[in-house]
Amino acid sequence: ARYGKSPYLYPLGY
């Protein structure tokens, strides 16, 4: 859930 841009705004992984 923190392998995207923001772990808090992108909980999906984007």
Curated annotation (Swiss-Prot):
Modified residues (Tyrosine amide): 14
Superkingdom assignment: Eukaryota
Key words of the record: Amidation
Name of the featured protein: Hypothalamic tetradecapeptide
Origin species: Sus scrofa
